[in-house]
């Protein structure tokens, strides 16, 4: 075995197939010592981390999952570009799925041609054990001349041993052999390699093989280096020798030879008495993958998720409300009555605290989506949804970004990079914001909690939870029909296909889930939190100035004076100015102010209402709900009724009230036109839907 140098500071490139446990292993190795960004010149997320062990400092780069080098999507091109263009001293940690050994070895054989020190971490040992088989890593090590080690990223088994091995000078090895062609082609390749030993020595065999494929009439996958990489003299030499050789190097020949080679290795490396396939396949798949029952199962699972969001979050929400209320009281005891106290209590504590209350529900949402991903269910849902989505011009490949929008549309839109078909990708980007996201939940919970009764149906589902589930379904249906319209008008193209291999069922890693929830919640608070704080302070000023002369209203209570103050403030006059446009959809001037501020971020609607209704840090969300229900217009009629509350929910379901979403659409499409188009069509859709529903409701009520 050829070993790497013993430097105490080096970089590891983590590579592997999708769903092999690579990112979970990355989390186990780096913990919270990681950061995300984008690769230079593209929008693919870059995940980096560091771990320190035995006086070594190891930098790890988690590359996007791929099945081979090359590909048409941005993430696959990045993986290829980083691996092929590796820096001196880099090492590759290849993560291999033991349950899909043949597929993993196909990719590994390509990587071995890059002439980089490699260590292989083998996952899914537990899946093999359930099948009553073993994968002999010693035989694989002897065959390739590199080290293979079992590790379980989900429970941490083998992590310490892997860290020990990573910092060992003998861990990362140069392979003693790579994929062998038949004897004639292999001899020809070796002869050429000896002639070109000074050219591109890092990955010479890989580049040379690609060059011979080009000369054989093959079109290289996007991002792969070929004949153009060589200068004129060696390029001419390769052409001349290839023409004299007379045999072609084709993808079909390579795939055939690789399959024979890998099957021969695994025939001895896989030992045991395997259970028949019928017993290995989960009985659940008979239901979850069924064309009809699979769709019903998906809807049922999502209904249970929304039910849990309401029932499980009640206690932590009450606790956070109590904390916010106590902080408001504490601050109020130290400050004298006046503008500063009002700013801190009503503007900062009241505004920001009104949104913080909903963190338990948002955290639960991130947790449930993480569980569905790690168990392998999301892949099965994609398979089931492929046929359904095909009727609307999309493939199952668009399903994962769409479902990811239930957490946040920003990473979901970034996730469309895996969609090779450009029209499918752009369509998915434009319809993803229609899916109910976590930023809408504070508004939904507030309005639904105030207007809809909290009673059970069938003894299981809460009416409020079912209402929120209905809004989620509405977003899914709207996105499908919007996709159909776009595919029939703007993005006419051939239908794309969806090819996937279902991952095995897995037990979620508690540590990985905790890290996922933590990172997403941190991102939510760091981005939305800053906007909420700024808007809350600005809105407090607009709602409290210019100050009214209270001596003009000697017989009014403080609550009545506060109403007049807001009505006569800058915010009040702005709301009154917009009221003629908003009245046809059932909104008064207070709702109008909330609508305008929420275009910065949807959750600001709650902060806005909290400030406008004067619910400060000493009150709770229940007080805000009560304030909404008690609010009346000039005629003494309730401002918040069922008709305009439904109208408001529909407006939030369809409007694009998120600056971050518009920014990421511009970044992903590299055009200002598409975010403007997205904002325009969603705003028109939101207003027209609310208008129709409210006016029809008024007509028949």
From Swiss-Prot:
InterPro entries: Fe2_transport_prot-B, Fe2_transport_prot_B_C, FeoB_GTPase, G_FEOB_dom, Gate_dom, GTP-bd, P-loop_NTPase. Residues 9-172 form the FeoB-type G domain. Gene3D superfamilies: P-loop containing nucleotide triphosphate hydrolases (3.40.50.300). PROSITE patterns: G_FEOB. It is a multi-pass membrane protein. The keyword Signal does not apply. Keywords: Cell inner membrane, Cell membrane, GTP-binding, Ion transport, Iron, Iron transport, Membrane, Nucleotide-binding, Transmembrane, Transmembrane helix, Transport. GO terms for molecular function: ferrous iron transmembrane transporter activity; GTP binding. Probable transporter of a GTP-driven Fe(2+) uptake system. This is Fe(2+) transporter FeoB.
